[in-house]
Structures are given as structure tokens and as C-alpha cells.
């Protein structure tokens, strides 16, 4: 029997780590050395964006200090590494790298048959209220990159041009909400991922399931059915229920404690909803409904 490889393709700031930790605690899939190895993303860039792969290696990846960080990564090496992370008492291993949501459809189509030959691959993507999720991510970047001297190693900027860019952003946008609104006006795939495009790209795999964060924390039974493993409850997360700056301080989620630097007003939420109407429409066209929690302002 093949081990399970459970791949989660984003979206960040949607309780991805509590999702992975729940699957670990319930004896389904081990997280391996880390929940986010970013191996597939680095491999993708090595093949399709070699110049940026070198930049990513020099400024981020090689500084992570883990056993899986290899400059000459291959898909074969990824397979062997993930198999080595399967532990007794678990059905398989998970890869919850949020960068999986940034892989191109071409690359995903290329690796799908290779991975499915070696693993029983299950793919999820977890999505949260689009307006609130976008603010949490953009606010977190604003917080960590405009005050980069006081961050942990994972947020350190090692590129002088990038440092200047964020210094200029701080000068232009005095707080996180003003910067967030500027990004809503010209949405990038990184800050505002199109959920449907991510789902379509990963649908080349045989087993794919979109997880709505608010729904699964209310009732995980549909998730249990998809993975074929009983999940009776989800671990606590910072974003459910939504509490903005008053979210709980869960020890292993310290990066998310202060992701929301400010509380969004009703007017802010309405503006965000209008700006992201295209995302809601795409979701409705694909899935035939909008989660009621996403319309709460």
C-alpha cells in the first residue's frame, strides 16, 4: 500500500498550520521536519525561473537550516525525503507549504503522475474569508518588513533593494490598512490569490478537495469523508472565530498573533468586499454558492 502524501496548496493566513497539526494529532499524516518545506516551489523555480531560483536560494532557502534544504533538489529527491518522514502510527506525511499555491499549472501537471506513482496523493487547499485573509497577510508583511530589525530569522530581508522598497512603502503608507487598500486596488496573485485558479491547477490530481476554513472548524465531517480518517474536532486557531487584534496567543502560532495590526471597521470590510467581488464571483461560478461566513461584515 502506498503511503499518503497530503499536499495542501495554501492559502496562507487561513489556519494552515492548525489544519496540519490537527491531521498530525489525529494520527492521519505526520508533518515531517516542518509543515512548510517549500521544496516543490524551489524545484519549480529551478526549472522555470532559474534566475529567481538562485535569488530565492541566496536570500531565503539556504538560510533555513534544515536537512531538506538542498541546492540541487530534484523531484526524485523530494519523493525519497517525504517517504523518510513517514512515521509509525501514521498513514503518511503532509506538505503544507503555502508556496504550493504559487506553482504553475504546467509544473503541477508535470509532477502529478510522478507523485501519484509513489504516493496516494490527496490535495487540499484551505480558504478563509477573502477580505479578512487578505488583510491578515498584507498586514503581516507590512509589520515584519517595515520594522525588519526586530523580526525573527524567517522574516529577515537580505536584499538591499527590497529593504529600500519597504522603507519607501512605510513612508507612503502610514499604517497597515492604508497599505492593504492600496494592494486591493491592484491585486497581485501573491497577496490576493484566485482560489478557483489554484483549485483548477491542482485538479490534475485524482483526489482534490477545497476546504473552507470557517466550515471545517464548525463541522469537520466532510473533511473526514474526503481523507477517509475520523476528524472529530479541529485544533484552535487564531482566525476562528474572527477576533482581529484580539485573537488568542497560541504558542506555536506566534507568527499569527500580531498579523492583524489593526481592526477592520465595517466600512473597511465593505470596501474590501467590493474590491474583491471578482474573487467571490469566480468562486460562485465554480462551486455554486458563497460560504455565509464570507459575507459577514
Tell me the role of every PLM-derived stretch.
Residues 103-125:
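ATP-dependent NMP and nucleoside kinases share a basic, alpha-helical "lid"
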Residues 66-73, 100-106, 214-218:
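Acidic-and-aromatic substrate-binding clefts and catalytic sites of carbohydrate-active enzymes
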Residues 72-86, 147-225, 272-282:
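PAPS-dependent sulfotransferase catalytic domain
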Residues 15-26, 107-113, 137-140, 188-189, ...:
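PAPS/PAP-binding and catalytic site of the sulfotransferase fold
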Residues 1-91, 95-97, 136, 141-169, 225-286:
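PAPS-dependent sulfotransferase catalytic core
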Residues 117-137, 214-216:
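Conserved phosphate-donor/acceptor-positioning beta-strand/loop module used by diverse small-molecule
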Residues 64-65, 95-102, 175-191, 260-268:
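Surface-exposed cleft-lining segments at the edges of enzyme active sites
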Amino acid at each position: 500500500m502506498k503511503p499518503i502524501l497530503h499536499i495542501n496548496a495554501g492559502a496562507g493566513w487561513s489556519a494552515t498550520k492548525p489544519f496540519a497539526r490537527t491531521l498530525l494529532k489525529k494520527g492521519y499524516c505526520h508533518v515531517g521536519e516542518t509543515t512548510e518545506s517549500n521544496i516543490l516551489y524551489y524545484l519549480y523555480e529551478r526549472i522555470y525561473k532559474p534566475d529567481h531560483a538562485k535569488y530565492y536560494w541566496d536570500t531565503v532557502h539556504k538560510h533555513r537550516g534544515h536537512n531538506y534544504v538542498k541546492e540541487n533538489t530534484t523531484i526524485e529527491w523530494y519523493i525519497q525525503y517525504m517517504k523518510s518522514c513517514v512515521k509509525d502510527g501514521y498513514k503518511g506525511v503532509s506538505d503544507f507549504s503555502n508556496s504550493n499555491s504559487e506553482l504553475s499549472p504546467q509544473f503541477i501537471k508535470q509532477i502529478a503522475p510522478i507523485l501519484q506513482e509513489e504516493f496516494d496523493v490527496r490535495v487540499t487547499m484551505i480558504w478563509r474569508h477573502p477580505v479578512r485573509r487578505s488583510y491578515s497577510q498584507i498586514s503581516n508583511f507590512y509589520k515584519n518588513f517595515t520594522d525588519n530589525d526586530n523580526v525573527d530569522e524567517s522574516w529577515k530581508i537580505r536584499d538591499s533593494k527590497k529593504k529600500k522598497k519597504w522603507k519607501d512603502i512605510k513612508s507612503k503608507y502610514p499604517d497597515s490598512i492604508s497599505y492593504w487598500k492600496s494592494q486591493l486596488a491592484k491585486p497581485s496573485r501573491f497577496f490576493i490569490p484566485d482560489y478557483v485558479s489554484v483549485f483548477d491547477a491542482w485538479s490534475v490530481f485524482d483526489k482534490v478537495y477545497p476546504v473552507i476554513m470557517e466550515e471545517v472548524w464548525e463541522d469537520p465531517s466532510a473533511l473526514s469523508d474526503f481523507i477517509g480518517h475520523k476528524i472529530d474536532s479541529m485544533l484552535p486557531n487564531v482566525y476562528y472565530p474572527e477576533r482581529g487584534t484580539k485573537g488568542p496567543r497560541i504558542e506555536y502560532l506566534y507568527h499569527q498573533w500580531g498579523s492583524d495590526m489593526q481592526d477592520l471597521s465595517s466600512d473597511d470590510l465593505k470596501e474590501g468586499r467590493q474590491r474583491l467581488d471578482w474573487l467571490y464571483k469566480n468562486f460562485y461560478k465554480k462551486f455554486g454558492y458563497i460560504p455565509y461566513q464570507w459575507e459577514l461584515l
